[in-house]
């Protein structure tokens, strides 16, 4: 599309709807010079860094409800990130200044217990020249903030990841607006938000065309420098995602807004402006998709997803605070796969005997076939359509809450409910089910358990059979993510601001993933917690068939370790990762090769492709589930041993959740110091 004629048409449309008064909002905000001098105390420095980072990352600010945290973030819902090179250079300069102050104020007691967190391009930090006595809470925050700053300097300065962050560019505008609407106050009678809330949505939508022009310039600079996104990201997140965005802004956004606006005096003009902004944004997204098709070769032979072993290990050490190297993690993954495969064999053997299926589990081949036969047997009880699928998930959530009340696992409010909603189309390429929490710094809004519809595909519905639902409902709902985030949000004033940050991005290839260790670790821990035997409940909350799927969920996260390390250290190709996944998670060897003539193999291979694609673009995220879960278990057992007979699992869980979304390694010693005999 011709850029000049496109802008001329956009201006005519804007005049027709009275939008020109907001056209300045379409341009990026002026470059903000970092405020100097920086504070000399850690708490003040932490707060300055927190505010600055959210000012520069307004969609992350929206996610956290930053406008409810500080007046300095009041306009964050009206903006998209300024990715212009000068703005990013100013950002890097600020982070380097912060790093220098952190080095000067570091007390010896805060020396990392894990490998050094210095980014690859930085020299080793000099010994601190100022000793600042920090409280135990501040020491936790210091370690975390130090890692965050190192990551941001590395990502922006060393990797220049913004030159290839294609999925970030595509997802941020949608997510920002989706989260805005999610957080709007419920005014009753189906109405959401006041005029200022919708004005912020409008201004952010109007900013999209200029935002995409900056993205194009950065991507072209990356192509010139050889800093190029993988072909799969170009096609799936880039081209397909841009087209999904075009449809969302052109059609879905105004349709979504209409009932929420209602018949209030400002509703009709606002809807007209949103419609006009959506049309303009839709055209910009269509043009962006065309740009990507013309700029990149989606059929090129080379793969560009692997981070490389040195980079991968740096992320493991700095972001996840785990001391292990890639080789050790790769072998650890294989051991975890063997562990949970053996557990599945045991349960499948028992199920087969009780169901009189006559299966043998003597040889390795028989074990694989036997597990698959049992799961095929369970898959016969599949939903007839997506409506029934969603009902099963909601029912499983209610059942899990009732079980939690029955065994007094947590103090559960009577009004607690779990909401399950369809995944927005723009996110469906990467997730089957996921949870997005309410913002910690605002009272408005509710968490969302996203479930991706199958489109009533019989083979895909078969993969979501009745026995498979409970485990996912536990992980994403209760006592997994929904319960975890609700508890943390209720105690947000007791959790340091820095612990909520998601440096780089909330959830895409730019993300640091530090928060994934405690949050996804808790989700997986919850699955296992609900499986603990209780009187008349051999498999805890689960039926035998459901428990088999719970074990498969544990196995899946073990496979992720092997695959994630393999992909990013080039121990596995993309296709080898798919084959490993289908063999060890689905017990369906060669599903990829048989997909053309076998609908079940095709559904399994397609699901595996989506999973491997996600791991390929999110290095280290996939390993956080298992690593995070086992860190919680180790902490629990250490606390149990130190506390003795007075140990309370409920108290332990509340204390853990009260630490906020920060890896166990950052607070282990402080936590255990309070685990004393009653």
Where in this protein do the model-derived segments appear?
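N-terminal export signals
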Residues: 5-28
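N-terminal maturation segment of proteins
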Residues: 27-678
